[in-house]
């Protein structure tokens, strides 16, 4: 929501769409740093640190969006719409309007730019986590005690890792706002479940044999998740049944590894019986 609120206000006040996206990413990074500092420096438990930051951001987001509500005198707002004109009297343009000359349909612009951004972000992530600092962040995430024993500044790595993850979250919120041309204080509700489901789906189907494979599995897991949801809605499933579909999909995905293991075990048993005979 922070990324969406920031990009909405930047666009409303006539900033360049790409610069607005960058500012929202920086704001997300700072929010992640705050969470990391609460945990590493103030010794607040991990989960509680995130809850504290998230609670504070609820009010901060409303304060930020208050700058984009025309005629608003209260100083805060729960939503911002980008369908009108900016402060210079020009129709608000998002990054998805950039390639309008290449594609006649708006949906093609959205798909093209999103694919382009995904490829760029994946390339940056893959390169960064292959560096010494990136490897230190990964090591800290896997085994903090062992990383500390190897001389890694685990507190700094935790802060950096949270900053990067929150920067990516803010980026997704900013893109979501530009696609839908609106930002509201509840747009982030349920995103955590979707993220976890995407990871589970990706790992269950593609596995996580290497870091490259892990990144791609998470990415394609998210795509598969939304394809299944969209397909169900296209087939006429009522909108209020989405949560039930989410639950069923996650359950099925969690069962897949168990089924694979059972099949593999059964094959090995048969092979052993044949060799025994």
Segments predicted by a language model, with ranges:
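Loop-to-transmembrane alpha-helix initiation sites
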Residues: 47, 75-77, 110-115, 158, ...
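Cytosolic-side transmembrane-helix boundaries in multi-pass membrane proteins
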Residues: 80, 87, 142-149, 153-156, ...
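Helix-loop-helix "hairpin" substructures at the membrane interface of multi-pass membrane proteins
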Residues: 16, 107-187, 192
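Transmembrane helix-bundle core of multi-pass membrane transporters
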Residues: 46, 50-53, 57-130, 160, ...
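Transmembrane alpha-helical segments in multi-pass inner-membrane proteins
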Residues: 22, 169-244
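Alpha-helical transmembrane segments within multi-pass membrane transporters and channels
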Residues: 17-55, 116-119, 220-221, 225
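Short, non-helical or kinked segments that cap or interrupt transmembrane helices
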Residues: 1-6, 17-18, 38-52, 133-136, ...
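Membrane-embedded helix boundary and interhelical linker motif in transport proteins
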Residues: 1-41, 66, 209-210, 234
């Amino acid at each position: 929501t922070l990324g969406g609120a920031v990009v909405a206000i930047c666009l409303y006040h006539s900033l360049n769409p790409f610069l607005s996206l960058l500012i929202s990413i920086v704001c997300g990074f700072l929010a992640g740093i705050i969470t990391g500092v609460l945990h590493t420096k103030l010794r607040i438990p991990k989960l509680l640190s995130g809850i504290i930051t998230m609670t504070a951001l609820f009010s901060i987001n409303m304060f930020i969006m208050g700058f984009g509500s025309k005629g608003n005198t209260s100083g805060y707002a729960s939503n911002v719409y980008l369908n009108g004109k900016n402060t210079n009297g020009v129709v608000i343009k998002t990054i998805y309007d950039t390639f309008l000359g290449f594609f006649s349909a708006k949906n093609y612009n959205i798909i093209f730019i999103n694919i382009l951004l995904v490829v760029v972000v994946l390339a940056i992530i893959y390169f960064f986590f292959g560096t010494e600092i990136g490897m230190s962040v990964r090591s800290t995430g896997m085994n903090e005690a062992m990383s500390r024993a190897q001389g890694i500044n685990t507190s700094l790595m935790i802060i950096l890792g949270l900053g990067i993850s929150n920067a990516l979250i803010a980026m997704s919120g900013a893109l979501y706002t530009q696609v839908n041309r609106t930002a509201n204080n509840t747009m982030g509700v349920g995103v955590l479940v979707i993220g976890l489901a995407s990871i589970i789906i990706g790992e269950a189907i593609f596995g996580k044999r290497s870091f490259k494979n892990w990144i791609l599995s998470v990415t394609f897991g998210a795509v598969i998740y939304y394809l299944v949801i969209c397909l169900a809605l296209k087939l006429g499933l009522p909108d209020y049944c989405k949560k039930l579909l989410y639950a069923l999909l996650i359950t099925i995905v969690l069962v897949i590894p168990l089924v694979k293991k059972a099949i593999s075990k059964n094959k090995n048993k048969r092979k052993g019986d044949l060799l025994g005979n």
